[in-house]
């Protein structure tokens, strides 16, 4: 990130050691001195051609802008793991996660920008591979149940049938487990939101597979 942005006018801030995605996003947005800020996530590798120069439309309602990422385990290209241009005011003033939808970002007005921002390299350990896949497919399955689309159906199919590279077997295990989890809970947001709690996920993983894996 520092290398790619060194000749750009953007100011880079690093946020780490914060528990919970919502709290981490709030911490990052609070460091910004502009109405919007780009958020880049640790499990990604930036596209060197991504210039961080998108201009939000101030005449429209405030929203978040989601850029594409390429999943390096199954080749899907869509917004999951992508850079997000967050409206800082909406992030900082966001209510507790219990009052939001399943996905924090999608709980607010959003616009998808079909520009490749980064490459998702999440399968750095068996647990990391499993966790990312589990969370994504449980979320996609919920979205498909609420508002069916061919895109979501296709993404679910790829997640649960295709994986290559490091820990590809754990990617598939996680994706299929996430689907199974949704099928058991149904569209119950309280139960589904457990998949966004790191402690719950680790306990679920270790209980199901009777092993303790690195959680880093």
What are these regions (language model features)?
Residues 20, 43-45, 72-73, 91:
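Short, solvent-exposed loop/turn segments at secondary-structure junctions
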Residues 13, 38, 65-66:
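Hydrophobic/aromatic beta-strand patches that form the interior of the parallel beta-sheet core
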Residues 54-216:
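Catalytic-site signature of metal-activated, phosphate-bearing donor transferases
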Residues 32-36, 58-59:
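Short, charged low-complexity intrinsically disordered segments located at boundaries
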Residues 35-51:
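Short beta-strand-to-loop acidic/aromatic patch adjacent to the donor-nucleotide binding site
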Residues 1-33:
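N-terminal anchoring/stem segment of glycosyltransferases
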Residues 4-5, 52-55:
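Short, glycine/charged-enriched secondary-structure capping and boundary segments
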Residues 11-16, 42, 59-61:
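Short linear motifs at secondary-structure transitions and domain/linker junctions
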